[in-house]
Regions:
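N-terminal donor/sugar-recognition subdomains of glycan-related enzymes
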Residues: 1-53, 63-65, 186-195
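Short N-terminal helix-initiation segments at or just after the protein's N-terminus
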Residues: 18-23, 60-61, 116-123
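Acidic/Gly/His-enriched mid-domain segments of enzyme catalytic cores or analogous surface patches
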Residues: 73-76, 82-173
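Glycine-rich anion-binding loop/nest that anchors nucleotide
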Residues: 55-60, 159, 174-188
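A generic local structural motif
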Residues: 39-43, 62-67, 104-106, 162-164
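A short secondary-structure junction signal
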Residues: 65-68, 109, 129-132, 151-153, ...
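Short, basic, glycine/proline-bearing loop/turn elements
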Residues: 49-55, 69-70, 145-152
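Glycine-rich N-terminal segment of FAD-binding domains in flavoprotein oxidoreductases
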Residues: 56-61, 65-69, 76-88
Length: 195
């Protein structure tokens, strides 16, 4: 699945940031080769379709959102990479983690050994980390370029974007953003360097 209009946005991103389509394709190909033969996309559908979902980012408001998450444990939690550490440190379990593997790798590996679905994104700058998918029990692959084999393109550029696009693609009844701050402050769980 590729969202309508994504290709033109992707070309703009390549141009604006100086990224390489060739490297994105190589990383996608590598990810595809490491994914399990049977990809259970229906597991994601069962968690999202016609249900409210929390999309959780690593913004500065995340610590204040934890009480809401603890109060509503049964609502599906789609967690952006950087927020994973905060979620598991507070005794919560992500249902889905969307990651390009630049967050806290210890937290990602720990979560990846559970039933959490790890949605791993391949791009030109993370090919050296793609092998981590072998440690994940339930893994789905995504790309920002043309999908191939078992690797999909649901849209989005950041982990947080991809969480929202994933929820939308699987027809969530309602998408509730937590820890997704649109200001200039970076949360303590976000990566330090910004592209």
């Amino acid at each position: 699945m590729t969202i309508v209009g994504w290709e033109s946005k992707y070309r703009e991103i390549l141009k604006d940031f100086g990224y390489s389509r060739k490297k994105d394709n190589q990383s996608c190909k590598l990810l595809n080769s490491l994914l399990p033969k049977k990809m259970r996309i229906t597991k994601i559908r069962d968690l999202i379709e016609n249900k409210p979902v929390f999309v959780i980012g690593a913004g500065p408001s995340l610590p204040f959102c934890l009480s809401v998450l603890k109060k509503h444990k049964k609502i599906t939690k789609i967690v952006a990479d950087g927020a994973t550490k905060a979620i598991i440190e507070n005794g919560l379990k992500p249902d889905i983690v969307v990651t390009d593997l630049d967050g806290d790798i210890i937290s990602l590996k720990k979560t990846g050994r559970t039933n959490t679905i790890m949605v791993v994104h391949a791009h030109g700058d993370n090919s050296e980390k793609i092998h981590f998918v072998k440690n994940f029990k339930n893994c789905i692959g995504t790309t920002q370029t043309k999908p191939m084999g078992r690797v999909r393109n649901f849209g989005g550029f950041t982990d947080g974007d991809r969480c929202v696009f994933l929820a939308s693609s699987f027809k969530a009844k309602k998408i509730i953003l937590l820890g997704m701050d649109f200001g200039t402050r970076i949360g303590k769980y976000s990566k330090i360097t910004v592209a």
